[in-house]
Amino acid sequence: MKRHYFIILTTILVLIMGCATPRINIFSVTPDPLKEYTLEGTGADKILLIPIYGLISDNPKKGLITATPSLVEQVVSQINKAQKDKQIKAVLFKINSPGGTITASDLLYHEISAYKEKTGSKIVISMMDLATSGAYYMSLPADIIMAHPTTITGSVGVISLQPKVKGLMDK
């Protein structure tokens, strides 16, 4: 009889533990720290490379297991870290993006402008395959904008209006 109760109690505990497991986040949600690479030279001054790939959005990217910060959050985090490093003399944004939401593109535009004003660092934009709409707009504070000969760029149609002129046409 005691064995019967033991089996029932063990089964209940296993089921309860299976339903109330602690949430363990295996993958980090926070962005990685900035990594430094010495490509050439021995000087102390640095150039920061920030890639802008994909849709510019302020929504976190959700995967099957974890979510990663949005592109805007990642870039703002890198810019904030760069403001603390006085050895960064220039920031190179490598862009391959079709643009994105108006607000997200405008946030990056203002973050880049504020960084440039606070630090005096040079801002360089390198446009790769695609830099249209919001990606083009966020590039405007740059000191230098370079586009590959095959880059598709422009198309800043960030606000689209469709006026209704039916009443006007009837007159």
Residue ranges and their predicted role:
Residues 15-18:
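C-terminal motif of bacterial Sec signal peptides marking the signal peptidase cleavage site
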Residues 20-121, 130-171:
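Small-residue-centered hinge/linker elements
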Residues 1-5:
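Positively charged n-region of N-terminal signal peptides that target proteins for export
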Residues 6-13:
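Sec-dependent N-terminal signal peptides
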